[in-house]
Amino acid sequence: SAQTYPIGLALCAHCGLAQLSHRVDSSIVFERYFSESFPLTENLVLERKQIPGFERFAQSTIVKTILSVGSGSGRSLQRYKRKGFTVIGIEPSDHQTNVSRNLGIDTLTSYLTETAVEEILSKYGQVDLVLVDNFTKVPHPAHISNVEDLSEYVNNLSRLVKPNGCVYLRVPYIGSILTFGLVDYVYHEHQSYFSYRSIKQLFASVGLHIQSAHLCSN
């Protein structure tokens, strides 16, 4: 029979960050992601919704370089490359990285580690826009909501982005989960579920501030 694990959320009364009260080893919960022998299909509907917002940002600032953390097979970045941006991917899956490189996307096989940050800074310097989103139909092991050390993660993000640059991220919102009883959004891959205050405090700890926040329908 299949192995089962308890699941529950622990909510911080101070900042509103919710995290799993029982964590399962990442090699178990992300086994499917790394065992796929074909490119994981990007969520194209999600991607189309993102593009207009990025274009408005690009028009108001000088955006030349875009870095995607957990870039999957690179198809989402390929659209930005066609628009003239320099695009870079960080992707822990060897298979996904190879697919991405075959599409012409310069992709580093790694999680968002200090070593990966040093390599990117050495090769490209800081970037204008960092994307942290899940472009695949299964939870991504390199997404901010799925990592154990949030402080290290956001510190690495802050090192990658230029002083006048931007970090775009989409995270599970604990407010909607609690208000509407969205228990099917809680599973072992997602270790953290964020409130506005928790994101604000987390990024303020590394000198970043929220420029805008929106509640998405998906």
Regions found by a protein language model. Give the residues of each.
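Extended interfacial segments that mediate partner engagement and assembly in macromolecular machines
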Residues: 3-99, 108
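Short, glycine-/aromatic-enriched active-site segment of Class I SAM-dependent methyltransferases
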Residues: 169-192, 196-198
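Conserved SAM-binding strand-loop segment of SAM-dependent methyltransferases
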Residues: 104-119
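Receiver (REC) domain switch-region micro-motif
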Residues: 66, 130, 167
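Conserved S-adenosyl-L-methionine
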Residues: 208-217
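A short glycine-rich, Lys/Arg-flanked "PGG" loop and its adjoining helix->strand segment in the class I
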Residues: 151-166
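A short acidic, Gly/Pro-enriched loop at the edge of an enzyme's catalytic core
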Residues: 118-130
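A short SAM/SAH-binding and catalytic strip from SAM-dependent methyltransferases
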Residues: 127-149
